[in-house]
Each structure stands twice: as C-alpha cells, then as structure tokens.
C-alpha cells in the first residue's frame, strides 16, 4: 500500500473508548486501504461498516451517518481534523504517503531555482510529515524557505486545502507545492497570484501552474450571468461547507440590485439535481471548488460569492473564494488523532 494506515494504533484507540461498531469513511483513492482496515478490525472483534458515499475532504465527516446506524465511532481516512462539531468520537487518519519527498525535490532542483531564492513551501496531509525534512534540504541548497502557519481550518503549518490557502499568505517570490495533481496548486496560483511550481513525489514530475487561462474562463462565466434575472443561491449542509450567513448575504445583495434570488439547500451540489428549477444562473455558497472545477457540467452560469460582487459592479479584481477560519490554537499530532462529541 502507498499510504500508512496505522492499524494497531487505531485498534488501540477504539478499545480505549470501548467502541464495538465503527464506520470507516474514505476518499475514492483509499478504498482498498479502508477494506483492508475493516478486515483487520473484524479479526479483532469490532463490527465494521464501510461508508460508500464520495468523500470530499475533512469538511465532510460522516459522523451523522455513523450515529444513525448505531456506530460507536467514525474512522475518517485521508484527511486531518477540521474544527467541527462531531456527533460520535472520530479518529482522523491522514494516511501519510510512503514516498520520499526529498528525492523528488533533488530531481527537480533546477526547476525550483526558477521560483527565486525566497520560496513558500506547501503540501497536503499526505506529505506533511516530511515537510521539515524538505525545508532542511531546500535550505541546504541555498533557499530561504517560508512555511505559513495557516488558520483554524488547517491542522499543521504548510498544509493546504482545496478551499483554504492561508498558509501561503506569507512572504516569498514563488510557491512550491509538494503533492500530486493540479487541484491544489491551481487554487494556490489563483488565490495568491504568485508563481507556483508543483512537484509530484510519486512520479517526480513537475508542473508550472498558469492561472490566467483559468481566470479568463471565470470572467466568461460572469459575463454569461450578466443578463440573468433569477438566481438560485446554493448552501450546503456539509458541516465544513455550511455558510448560511454568507448565502443569505448574497440573496440580499442580488435582490438589492434588482435580481430575484432564492436559497437552495443541498448536500452534494451538482447541476443534474437542479434541472427542474427555473433559475437562469446559480451561486454556490458551499465548496468553492464546485463552480470552479465543475462548471463544464452546468448548463447555466454558476458563480462564487466574490464573482457575484463583480457581476454587480461591487468588485473589480478577481479574487479566489476561500473558506477561512480564525486563529489556530495548536497543531494536530503527526499521526492519528481522535476528537470526541461536543
């Protein structure tokens, strides 16, 4: 397996809290690990259910579902704890990657130098345990490395989420992202407008991220919504995405500027569920990535709250929609962590 799932530690915690039945929640990339963990726990006399819905991140814990099916605890794989109220004790397992970050950096040192001498280093939960080692290596190569602390939605300095890039709001000429895919580095580039180099520790490949093409597409969405009179404003019931006050603000703003607007409550936000409504455009006040990454599947224009402000002439510069928190009191431990009901 490519990721660390500390089965014995998880079992120890479950025994400590007296859990007899658990629900395991995992993203699609960790389904095999979830099944393997289930087998191990059942061998140790713990009843296990697997959560089959798509998981979008730490913002979407299945604690409510765990409680409904009589589970004593939830095991959440692949993400770290986000400060949210929980209905059952929940074990967060970051699933650290078993791959060397430094080896990938060594392979791409020439590209990293193009960022400049003062760089900001970021990563995801899967590689966060190697961030200190990465920083030391880069400093030995002559770089001045900044790692931002981030806010209360972040577990560790340097960690990015798809909706939160607070760790990158520090001084630096460019940003180095350590991780796979362009999901996070694209968000970094749009949120900070800095040069972003992504290095994949699994393949050792690099990618330079250009946000301008992406931003042009967003301006096109705003233009398409310019003549819309009826707006559906979507709010999510996922705990870490629930922004009801912001959604109500957007409804009020649209009405103030002569548009019709109605609030729509959803769990998973996608256009197919909205086909029968007569709205001419939508505003997603839930996961900020839905209108940005999935807009091609929408037959109507779909905007973020900040894009609505541009539409109404209240904002000129394009700004990435983030879900930000307050100051973080302490970091999470490196490894599993358990958080109880509140």
UniProtKB/Swiss-Prot annotation:
Keywords for the protein's UniProt record, in alphabetical order: 4Fe-4S, Iron, Iron-sulfur, Metal-binding, S-adenosyl-L-methionine, Transferase
The reaction(s) this protein catalyses: L-histidyl-[translation elongation factor 2] + S-adenosyl-L-methionine = 2-[(3S)-amino-3-carboxypropyl]-L-histidyl-[translation elongation factor 2] + S-methyl-5'-thioadenosine + H(+)
Lineage top rank: taxon: Archaea
Residues that bind [4Fe-4S] cluster: 59, 163, 287
A single MF term (Gene Ontology): 2-(3-amino-3-carboxypropyl)histidine synthase activity
Entry keyword annotation includes Cell membrane: no
Result of changing residue 59 to A: Still able to bind a 4Fe-4S cluster. Less active than wild-type. Not able to bind a 4Fe-4S cluster and loss of catalytic activity
The keyword 4Fe-4S is assigned to this record: yes
Details of cofactor binding: Binds 1 [4Fe-4S] cluster per subunit. The cluster is coordinated with 3 cysteines and an exchangeable S-adenosyl-L-methionine.
Pathway given in the UniProt record: Protein modification; peptidyl-diphthamide biosynthesis
The EC number(s) this enzyme carries: 2.5.1.108
GO biological processes: protein histidyl modification to diphthamide; S-adenosylmethionine catabolic process
Cofactor(s), by name: [4Fe-4S] cluster
Record-stated family: Belongs to the DPH1/DPH2 family.
Role summary: Catalyzes the first step of diphthamide biosynthesis, i.e. the transfer of the 3-amino-3-carboxypropyl group from S-adenosyl-L-methionine (SAM) to the C2 position of the imidazole ring of the target histidine residue in translation elongation factor 2 (EF-2).
Other comments on record: Unlike the enzymes in the radical SAM superfamily, Dph2 does not form the canonical 5'-deoxyadenosyl radical. Instead, it breaks the C(gamma)-S bond of SAM and generates a 3-amino-3-carboxypropyl radical intermediate. Thus, the P.horikoshii Dph2 represents a previously unknown, SAM-dependent, [4Fe-4S]-containing enzyme that catalyzes unprecedented chemistry. Moreover, the chemistry requires only one [4Fe-4S] cluster to be present in the Dph2 dimer, although each monomer can bind a [4Fe-4S] cluster. In contrast to eukaryotes that require four gene products (DPH1, DPH2, DPH3 and DPH4) to catalyze the first step of diphthamide biosynthesis, no other protein than Dph2 is required in P.horikoshii.
Stored NCBIfam families: arCOG04112, diphth2_R
PANTHER family reported for this sequence: 2-(3-AMINO-3-CARBOXYPROPYL)HISTIDINE SYNTHASE SUBUNIT 1, DIPHTHAMIDE BIOSYNTHESIS PROTEIN
Subunit structure: Homodimer.
Protein name: 2-(3-amino-3-carboxypropyl)histidine synthase
């Amino acid at each position: 397996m490519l990721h660390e799932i500390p089965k014995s530690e998880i079992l120890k915690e479950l025994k400590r809290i007296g859990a007899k039945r658990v629900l395991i929640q995992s993203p699609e990339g960790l389904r095999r690990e979830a099944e393997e963990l289930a087998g191990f726990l059942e061998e140790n006399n713990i009843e296990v259910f697997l959560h089959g819905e798509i998981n979008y991140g730490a913002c979407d814990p299945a604690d409510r579902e765990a409680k409904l099916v009589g589970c004593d605890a939830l095991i959440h794989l692949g993400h770290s704890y986000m400060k949210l109220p929980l209905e059952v004790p929940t074990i967060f397992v970051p699933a650290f990657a078993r791959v060397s970050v430094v080896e990938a950096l060594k392979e791409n040192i020439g590209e990293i130098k193009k960022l400049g001498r003062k760089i900001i280093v970021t990563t995801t939960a899967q590689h966060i345990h190697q961030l200190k080692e990465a920083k030391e290596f880069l400093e030995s190569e002559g770089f001045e490395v900044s790692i931002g602390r981030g806010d209360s939605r972040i577990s560790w300095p340097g960690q990015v989420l798809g909706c939160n890039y607070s760790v990158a709001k520090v001084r630096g000429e460019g940003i180095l992202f350590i991780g796979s895919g362009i999901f996070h580095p694209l968000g970094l580039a749009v949120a900070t407008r800095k040069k972003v180099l992504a290095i994949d520790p699994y393949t050792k490949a690099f990618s330079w991220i250009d946000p301008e093409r992406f931003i042009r597409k967003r301006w096109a969405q705003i233009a398409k919504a310019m003549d819309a009179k009826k707006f559906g404003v979507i709010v999510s019931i996922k705990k870490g995405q629930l922004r009801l006050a912001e959604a109500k603000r957007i409804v009020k703003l649209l009405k103030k500027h002569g548009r019709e607007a109605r609030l729509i409550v959803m769990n998973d936000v996608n256009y197919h569920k909205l086909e029968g409504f007569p709205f001419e455009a939508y505003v997603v006040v839930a996961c900020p990535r839905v209108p940005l990454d999935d807009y091609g599947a929408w037959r109507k224009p779909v905007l973020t709250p900040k894009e609505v402000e541009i539409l109404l002439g209240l904002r000129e510069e394009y700004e990435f929609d983030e879900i930000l928190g307050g100051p973080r009191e302490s970091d999470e431990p490196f490894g599993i962590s358990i958080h109880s009901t509140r």
